[in-house]
Amino acid sequence: ALFVGLAGCTEQVSQFQLTRPVSSLNSYQHAIVSIHGEGLDITTQYGFRETTEVMHKKIVSAIRPTGLFNTINGDHDGSSQLEVAILITEFRYVSGPKRSLAWFFANDAILGGLIQLKDKDSGKIVGEMSFIEKSGDQKAMLSDYTGKQINKVTNLTLALLTTI
């Protein structure tokens, strides 16, 4: 009876919205990927640092084979740079093992914020997308955990960079 009472309490949410479409990225030879949290209540949470490190690696690895940029997070020759900035505004960490083994005790995994493409010199935003990922409990132990949400944000970032 406890199992039935806990299941189906919250729904999974996976939403994104293009808030500023990208016109062209042809003028950028170099990219810098940065990930930040909005405020101490986000950045001091358990799992935040690990999440940003994994997300940074995945985004850089996803961008590199596209050939869009000569360098990513490296030295540049003075030509224009594009900052791929992720601002995390909502966050709650849930690990994969916790989701699998103790899903009925795990809270919803939450990862939300903004993906901004900025001209590094002027600070002008040349593309922007908002996103929110919440795990819910309808899929029980198969619900998303933070690692799956990182993969979704990586895919959204790549989509923003490559869709014109």
PLM-predicted stretches and their roles:
Residues 1-9:
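Sec-dependent bacterial lipoprotein signal peptides
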Residues 8-60, 128-132, 161-164:
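A structural "domain/chain start" motif
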Residues 12, 74-125, 135-140:
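Surface-exposed short loop/turn segments
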Residues 30, 69-71:
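A short amphipathic beta-strand at an alpha->beta junction
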Residues 46-57, 105, 140-151:
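Soluble non-cytosolic domains of exported or imported proteins
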Residues 60-68, 93, 158-163:
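Sec-exported extracytoplasmic/periplasmic mature domains
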Residues 121-163:
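Short secondary-structure boundary motifs at beta->alpha junctions and helix caps
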